[in-house]
Amino acid sequence: MRQHDRWPASLLLVRHAESAGNVARELAEANGDPLIDIALRDMDVPLSELGERQSRAVGLWLAGLGRRAPSVVLTSPYVRAERTASIALAAAGLELPLVLDERLREREFGVLDRLTKAGIQQRYPDQAEARSRIGKFYHRPPGGESWCDVALRVRSVLDSVTREHSGKHVMIVAHQVVILMFRYVIERLGESDVLRISREVDLANCSVTTFAVDRRNPQGMTLEQFNEVFPLEEAAAPVTREPDVPLAPR
């Protein structure tokens, strides 16, 4: 099989819609609270009402893709991602099975889970210092993951996609860092490249990032769109973003 024949025809990456956790985190950061006030496990946090509306907007956009509509859908098993995918497919009228893949889950935060910037500084100042010194690409909090760890998961997912879904239109619903790591792996970026992208943009909820197979590109696929929100704008759905916690310069 030739190199380009291994890839899907297109790869559509969608960040999950706004969740109740996004709302709680924004409130905690605004109030300077050390802890995000939500009792659920991160993987169980549901969408907000706005998040459900955003998901339907993505579905309406999917319905208009015609021959480029997804034929395969993979999603993080976290509730906010799975519900985004389910609602979008229903709104699009696409009857496709969801493939839940734990490799697409959110980055594990370990001991820093549910802590705000202020909370991390108060409870784990050593981790704040380590992240500042090492940088967030390589820093791994106790019990958690670095961005490199997420990149390893993404490489594994891409191995599966190229093996099982070559030539197909594949949609993946996942999380902010996971989507950034898809760019890192597919485009063969360096640490400084992906950190620059992270500094410049915060991925919007339900934003769309697309790659298409490109026979002129030795890497196999070319980035077509990144962090686009036109599906939301076309449906007059509010755009929301959850910025990365700025523990250290990015």
Question: Where are each of the predicted segments found?
Answer:
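Acidic, low-complexity terminal tails and accessory targeting/binding regions
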Residues: 1-11, 94, 107-121, 184-250
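Short, well-ordered beta-to-alpha junction loops that form the rim of enzyme active sites
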Residues: 16-17, 75-79, 97, 103, ...
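Residue-level preference for the first positions of well-ordered beta-strands
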Residues: 11, 165-173
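Active-site-proximal alpha-helix that buttresses catalytic centers in soluble enzyme cores
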Residues: 2-96, 100, 123
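Short, active-site-adjacent cap segments at secondary-structure transitions
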Residues: 20, 80-82, 106-107, 178-180
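Active-site signature of alpha/beta-hydrolase-fold catalytic machinery across serine-
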Residues: 87, 181-185
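Glycine-rich phosphate-binding loop signature in dinucleotide/nucleotide-binding domains
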Residues: 65-69, 161-168
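Phosphate-handling substructures
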Residues: 20-46, 91-155, 222-227, 235-242, ...
